[in-house]
Amino acid sequence: MSRPIVAIVGRPNVGKSTLVNRIAQTSDAIVHQSRGVTRDRSYHVADWNGREFMLVDTGGIEPMKSDDVFATSIRDQALAAAEEAAVILFVVDGSVGVTEEDESVARMVRKLKKPTFLLVNKLDNPARENDSLWEFYSLGVGEPVAVSALHGHGTGDLLDEVVALLPEDAGDADDEPDTLRVAIIGRPNAGKSSLFNKMIGNDRSIVSNIAGTTRDAIDTVVERNGKRYRMVDTAGIRKKSTVYENIEYYSMVRGLRAIDRADVALLVVDASTGVTEQDQKVANLAIERGCALVVLLNKWDLLKDDYEREAVMETVDRRLTMAPWAEYLRISAMTGRSVHKIWDMVDAAAERRASHITTSQLNRLLTDMREFGHTVSDGKRRLKMHYVTQTGDKPPAFTFFVNHTDLVTDNYKRYIENRMRATFDFKGTPIRLRFRAKKSDKDKE
């Protein structure tokens, strides 16, 4: 499912990150009294009355004359976020009034001609809010709306109006049940475009070009050996009609949108530089959203000797510890080395992502684990796992019914996942483990 984007913009220290935490019901956004704490944009899945959208938190926008060395980059990224958005939330500080910085942001927002809500934050006294709103009409971006991000005042009515303006989902996730959606993701210049072109070369039948949900991205539907693949195109980063271009930002946004729509993510890594922090972030996004993951070490032919090859694999081991189960393939998109193997790896990863394990198979594993005797306790209580069942797929999700959920540590979760992966074939796909409390008759005594 492709989620529409809602961008939050404003000058520094008006409460944008607090509002993000309120709307997305998370504490991931860093909140601090100092200016400029949020320098990079961050992404959060939010839900209001069953309608999901992607909330983008941007850094504080400062005037072009600012002495802050990050100001230009932050401004560029905030504008890029606003350009990608279906709805803009422009946040100002009601306790301070209109500032020159607010007016600068307002000029930027007005030029975009997007649906915009002007949110006057930090109005924690509803009885006095009308007295504080009138001066914000001068910004020329519509009627000011009083909110308190800290206490939640006004946010419910706001979200009702926001979701009413969001475009309907394209529905491509469910309209093509026999088509496998594949996203080619990764940082700029890793070789995504070359790989994309090589994969859909002359020996394939290109059925159609379909406009994707991201502006000016094209999805290509390919038929190969009787199977259909929808290649979610993030390979080409097209130029925007604005001088505020930020290639890394657009790459990240398009990768994010592609991941939301994909069954399998192909993470293209430039082997000449190894796995970077941005590769790590993109891999994490794919895992969080439940994509099967295939890591393609591109430009392998440029590595000169075993020493360089070992150094690259060291970055893989160090940076991609969150996905030891991922499939890896050494390729050259330029020469075509091993590119033909990608299709079989995509098929296998997608099949495992859709795996169904019977309850009897799962509980046989649980019996083996009990007999092995590995469990956890807090000295007074001992964890007992009564039974387990599969409760979802794409990716596979399993619910364990236990006596005390608070005894389940992260280490024990990893132990269970490792045992499950050793027993069942989940190569290439994440799995989800959930734990619910269920006391046996003996526990109740």
Show the residue positions of the predicted features.
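Conserved G1/Walker A P-loop phosphate-binding module
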Residues: 1-69, 167-252, 256-259
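Conserved nucleotide-binding/hydrolysis micro-motifs of P-loop NTPases
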Residues: 35-37, 60-62, 95-97, 122-127, ...
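Switch II of P-loop NTPase G domains
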Residues: 37-40, 53, 59-86, 91-108, ...
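Canonical P-loop GTPase G-domain recognition
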Residues: 115-117, 124-174, 292, 301-357
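Long, well-ordered amphipathic alpha-helical subdomains in the mid-to-C-terminal portions
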Residues: 183, 343-350, 355-416
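Acidic, glycine-rich loop-and-beta core segments that form the ion-binding/anion-interacting portion
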Residues: 215, 220-296, 301-304, 311
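Short, non-transmembrane amphipathic alpha-helical segments
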Residues: 316, 412-426
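A short amphipathic beta-strand at an alpha->beta junction
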Residues: 425-440
